[in-house]
Amino acid sequence: MNITLILFLIGILGFVLNRKNIILMLISIEIMLLAITFLILVSSLNMDDIIGQTYAIYIIVVAGAESAIGLAILVAFYRLRGSITIEYK
């Protein structure tokens, strides 16, 4: 469980510290989702329950769909602005 906490904190730090790069923000969100998935899998194996493994597969599918949608939005953003950096004013 310590590994999942470390992974989740790395994802949060990556999201907070890289506020200008959209790709790094998406990668940080994926790291957070995979940390939660790993925690659910470890808990499922400790409790000897198959439901947690089913939830983990569901989370991985949702994370893949989220990545595809995020990258599609990123391509549209790049075509509109010509850059993927976010400018705060």
Swiss-Prot record:
It catalyses: a ubiquinone + NADH + 5 H(+)(in) = a ubiquinol + NAD(+) + 4 H(+)(out). Its main location: mitochondrion. It comes from the Eukaryota. It is an enzyme of class 7 (translocase). One of its GO terms (molecular function) is NADH dehydrogenase (ubiquinone) activity. Keywords: Electron transport, Membrane, Mitochondrion, NAD, Respiratory chain, Translocase, Transmembrane, Transmembrane helix, Transport, Ubiquinone. GO terms for cellular component: mitochondrial membrane; respiratory chain complex I. Its EC number is 7.1.1.2. The keyword ATP-binding does not apply. Belongs to the complex I subunit 4L family. NCBIfam families: PRK05715.1-2. This is NADH-ubiquinone oxidoreductase chain 4L. It comes from Neurospora crassa (strain ATCC 24698 / 74-OR23-1A / CBS 708.71 / DSM 1257 / FGSC 987). The lineage of its organism: Eukaryota, Fungi, Dikarya, Ascomycota, Pezizomycotina.
